[in-house]
Amino acid sequence: DCLKFVEREKRRGHTYHGILMDPPSYGRGPNGEMWKFEKEVTRLIQACVEILDENSLFFLINSYTTGFSSIVLDNTLRTMILPNHPNGIVETGEIALPIANRDLLLPCGIYGSWQRK
């Protein structure tokens, strides 16, 4: 699973100049471990922040999990990334599809990013 991969990369001393991720809303590991985005995403983001190189350029996450707002993601990114990488900006928002022949949008998910200034 991705959290184990990131933790292994940290132990090996590997760092990254950018991270792009699309974690699932729900999943089960090979030994019955359960992944729920709402409960685990902060651990995953924190682990990823720990392997971001000091000269990193970007961090991007998107999610199609219902019930997890872009405000929560914004707060999470600001409190986890900016203290270690203050030379960047955080942006979050909603992902939506236009509804044909209507002036409406169908909400699909959220995104969040940090990028170097």
For the regions a language model picked out, list residue spans one by one.
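Conserved proline-anchored active-site loop of SAM-dependent methyltransferases
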Residues: Y16-P30
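Conserved protein kinase catalytic core
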Residues: E7, R28, F68
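C-terminal catalytic and target-recognition region of SAM-dependent MTase-like enzymes
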Residues: S56-K117
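Short basic/hydrophobic patches in alpha-helices and adjacent helix-turn junctions
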Residues: R8-R11, A47-I51, F58, T79
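Glycine-rich, phosphate-binding/catalytic loops in enzymes
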Residues: K36-K39, L77-R78
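S-adenosyl-L-methionine
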Residues: D1-L20
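Glycine/threonine-rich flexible loop motifs
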Residues: G29-F37
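A short glycine-rich, Lys/Arg-flanked "PGG" loop and its adjoining helix->strand segment in the class I
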Residues: E38-E54
